[in-house]
Amino acid sequence: MTTKEFAKILQDKLTSEYGVDLSVASHQQIYRALALICRQMMSENHKKFQSKAIGTGSKQVYYLCMEFLMGRSLKMSLFNLGLNDAAQKALAEADISLDSIYEEEPDAGLGNGGLGRLAACYLDGMATTSICGTGYSILYEYGIFKQKIVDGWQQERADNWLPGGQVWLKSHPDQAVEVRFDGEIHENWDHGFHYIQHTNYNSVMAIPSDMYVQGYDGKGVAKLRLWQAKAPDFDMSSFSLGNYNTAMSKNASAELISKVLYPNDNHVEGKILRLRQQYFLSAASIGDIVQNHLSTYGTLENLDRKSTRLNSSHA
């Protein structure tokens, strides 16, 4: 892509999203416009890559992990899409440094350490080597924490990364998965078939949002599907009666699952929350994998076309 072509795409995006010209756009607006351009291109590339993989019968790989340390996406996305030089020159003509735009992006609050970095590298590696790969994790509202030292003491603050990072995410509420907690399981056999009935359960809806990882030199694209926990409905009856706390408690309990990466587990409540997070991720992801397979092939007889890996190298 030429500098002139990229400059037009960038200006069109700034106009449609913010109604501004490049010459007066803020650095935050330019960052978001560039992110949207990359996201759209990667989404289109992923659709083509996925269709080709299904058409050739390639095995699809799914990687589940509680964290993905993705870092910042703009620089790598522009580079892997082959747009870095064009973007740099287009901005330079407006006397804007691309490096200064990179600084507008927060680190994604989806990972913390080596486990998450390993997971992110697997996604990048699968995309670059043209393996049809999908990562699954939780869309944490807050990263683990931001550290600040005051008078020699550490103070922890919430890592509110979504205001700057959500531009990379595409929500798909139509593909939500119901995850059931608690309740009772009843099972019986009838004419050789095993029937399971789940009663008195509490439902939490797993709402997926997707972000993409472009492989180097445009070879392949990996998808990271992130689950956000939501209550299935709102208790309007309690709210109408003035029982506001009761009405909100169901929503708060559900949304707590995707609130914070690695909640403190030095107490029983924290241990329970971590267990709920792990079950939520597993149940939503397996449900999504099975549903996608049935939509594509109409049968589970060829489920060996899927390969699922749970990242358990770290306790």
PLM regions with names:
Residues 1-56, 60-62, 66, 72-84:
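Extended, charge-enriched "interface" segments that sit outside catalytic cores
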Residues 306, 310-315:
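Single conserved hydrophobic/aromatic residue that forms the stacking wall/gate
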Residues 25-42, 141-224:
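Extended, Lys/Arg-enriched charged tracts that mediate electrostatic binding to polyanionic substrates
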Residues 86-108, 241, 246-269:
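Residues forming anionic-ligand binding surfaces in small-molecule and nucleic-acid pockets
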Residues 218-256, 275-294:
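Carboxylate/His-rich catalytic cores and anion/metal-binding grooves
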Residues 46-50, 57-130:
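Long, structured ligand/cofactor-binding scaffold of large enzymes
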Residues 13, 37, 41, 45, ...:
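Generic, well-ordered alpha-helical scaffold segments in large soluble proteins
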Residues 122-124, 128-147:
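Glycine-rich phosphate/pyrophosphate-binding loops
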